UniProtKB/Swiss-Prot annotation:
UniProt record similarity statement: Belongs to the ClpX chaperone family. HslU subfamily.
The keyword ATP-binding appears for this protein: yes
Any one GO MF annotation of this record: ATP hydrolysis activity
Encoding gene (name): hslU
The protein's name: ATP-dependent protease ATPase subunit HslU
Keyword terms of this UniProt record: ATP-binding, Chaperone, Cytoplasm, Nucleotide-binding, Stress response
Length: 436
C-alpha cells in the first residue's frame, strides 16, 4: 500500500516543504527505506529485523513534527501524532498509551477503505446511474427508453429533476463504541450490532432530491455494498503493523530528574507504559489484535530542562537513533518564507487573490520579516518558524481586514511597511511578549 522511495528521493521530497535539518531528513529517509528492505526478506529473518526508532532533539518550531507528518503523507502510511503529556499511567484518570495504537488502527482502516473505494469507483458510479434511471423511468422500462434517458442524464439535461431514492440509514448504526467513565478518549473495543450481523437488517430511508444531488449518496451506498469489510479490516491491521508511524511529541516533559515528587512518579509510569509498545507487544482493538513490533516510533522533545539521559534507560535503548535539529538561523527563516511549495508568502498571496487583491512582497520586506522574527526569538522566547506566522499576521492585519472592500487593487509590501506595522511593538519588549 505504501509508496516506496529511495532515501535520496525521500530527502528530495522533504526538501520541497521543509528547510534545512538534513540530518533528521536522512535519518527518517533511511528508517523508511529499511521498512521496504525488511519486506523483501524471507521469514524468519523478516520477523527478526526491528525498526530503528528515532529520538529527535531540538527546540520548538524547527521542523520535528513537520518532517514526521510529511514523511507519513509521502509514504501513504498510517500516521498518528500524540503528545506524551496527554497520557497517564494505567490506573490513573486519563488516557492510557494503548489508545495510541487503537487510534493508529482507526486511521489505517480509513486509509484502506478510501483506497478500496477508489478501486471500485467506476463500478459504484455505474450502479448508481442504474438506480437513478430506475427512479426516473421505472425498473420495467424498455432498454430503448433507458438508453434515451441515460443519454439525457449524462448530458446534464435531467440534473434539476426531482426523484425519490432509497439509501441506507447510517444513523441507525452510529454507536459503535462506548466511552469508559472517568477516562475521556478511552474506548472499549466493542463492535456494533450491524458489524456482528453483517448486512442483515440494515435500515433504509427514502429521500427526495434532485438528480444532481442523488449521485453522491447513491455512489456511497453502492460502494458500501461492493466493499468487503472483513478484507478491509485484515489489510488495515497488516498495514498498521508493518507501515504504521507513531510520532510522540513532548517526550522531554515526561523525562524525570532525581526527586521523589508524585508527579515524577506518574511521569515515570507513563514511560514504563510506553516501553512494551515501543519494544513490541499485542494490543486488543475492536478490529482484532495488533502487534506493535514493527511500528516505527519517532519521539521528539526540546529537552530544555531535562536531558535525553533523564529518560528511563530502557526507553533510551529503544530509541537508538538520535538526531539533533539545529535552531533556525536568519537565513533559514528567510528561506522558509519563500522556498517551500506552500511557503507563507505564497499562502498569503493566494488568500488575497481570492478577494481579487494583488499582493506583492519585496525582497527587502522578506529580509525585514526574517530580521524581526530572529530578534523576537532571541529576546522573548525561541519558537522557531512559528514566529514568522505571528509577524506575518501582524504585518498583513490591515490588508486582510479591508481586502473585501479593495477588490481590483494592488498592495506592495516593502521593508518600510513591515517596520511601520511592527516596529514599535517589536521595540517594546513588555508589549511584544503579549502580542508577538
Amino acid at each position: 500500500m505504501c509508496i516506496v522511495f529511495s532515501p535520496r528521493e525521500t530527502v528530495s521530497e522533504l526538501d520541497r516543504f521543509i528547510i534545512g535539518q538534513n540530518d533528521a531528513k536522512r535519518s527518517v529517509a533511511i528508517a523508511l527505506r529499511n521498512r521496504w528492505r525488511r519486506q523483501q526478506l524471507d521469514e524468519p529473518m523478516r520477523e527478526e529485523v526491528m525498526p530503528k526508532n528515532i529520538l529527535m532533539i531540538g527546540p520548538t518550531g524547527v521542523g520535528k513534527t513537520g518532517i514526521a507528518r510529511r514523511l507519513a503523507k509521502l509514504s501513504g502510511a498510517p500516521f498518528v501524532k500524540v503528545e506524551a503529556t496527554k497520557f497517564t499511567e494505567v490506573g490513573y484518570v486519563g488516557r492510557d498509551v494503548e489508545q495510541i495504537i487503537r487510534d493508529l488502527v482507526e486511521i489505517a482502516v480509513s486509509l484502506v477503505r478510501e483506497k478500496k473505494r477508489d478501486e471500485i469507483k467506476e463500478k459504484a458510479h455505474m450502479n448508481a446511474e442504474e438506480r437513478v434511471l430506475d427512479a426516473l423511468v421505472g425498473k420495467t422500462a424498455s432498454p430503448a427508453t433507458r438508453d434515451s434517458f441515460r443519454k439525457k442524464l449524462r448530458e446534464g439535461e435531467l440534473d434539476e429533476k426531482e426523484i425519490e431514492i432509497e439509501v441506507a440509514d447510517n444513523n441507525s448504526n452510529s454507536a459503535s463504541t462506548f466511552d469508559i467513565p472517568g477516562m475521556p478518549g478511552a474506548q472499549m473495543g466493542i463492535m456494533n450490532l450491524s458489524d456482528i450481523l453483517g448486512k442483515m437488517g440494515n435500515r433504509t430511508k427514502v429521500r427526495k432530491t434532485t438528480v444532481r444531488d442523488a449521485f453522491k449518496p447513491l455512489i456511497d451506498d453502492e460502494s458500501e455494498k461492493l466493499l468487503d469489510q472483513e478484507q478491509i479490516i485484515q489489510e488495515a491491521l497488516r498495514v498498521a503493523e508493518n507501515d504504521g508511524i507513531v510520532f510522540i511529541d513532548e517526550i522531554d516533559k515526561i523525562a524525570t530528574k532525581d526527586g521523589g515528587a508524585s508527579a515524577a512518579v506518574s511521569r515515570e509510569g507513563v514511560q514504563r507504559d510506553l516501553l512494551p509498545l515501543v519494544e513490541g507487544t499485542t494490543i486488543a482493538t475492536k478490529y482484532g489484535q495488533i502487534k506493535t513490533d514493527h511500528i516505527l516510533f519517532i519521539a521528539s522533545g526540546a529537552f530544555h530542562v531535562s536531558k535525553p539521559s533523564d529518560l528511563l534507560p530502557e526507553l533510551q535503548g529503544r530509541l537508538p537513533i538520535r538526531v539533533e535539529l539545529n535552531p533556525l538561523t536568519r537565513e533559514d527563516l528567510r528561506r522558509i518564507l519563500t522556498e517551500p511549495e506552500a511557503s507563507l508568502i505564497k499562502q498569503y498571496i493566494a488568500l488575497m487573490a481570492t478577494e481579487e487583491v494583488h499582493l506583492e512582497i519585496t525582497d527587502d520586506a522578506i529580509d525585514a520579516l526574517a530580521d524581526i522574527a530572529v530578534d523576537l526569538n532571541a529576546r522573548i522566547e525561541n519558537i522557531g518558524a512559528r514566529r514568522l506566522q505571528t509577524v506575518m499576521e501582524r504585518v498583513l492585519d490591515e490588508i486582510s481586514f479591508t481586502a473585501p472592500d479593495k477588490a481590483g487593487t494592488s498592495f506592495k509590501i516593502d521593508a518600510a511597511y513591515v517596520r511601520k506595522s511592527i516596529g514599535e511593538l517589536a521595540a517594546d519588549i513588555d508589549l511584544s511578549r503579549f502580542i508577538l
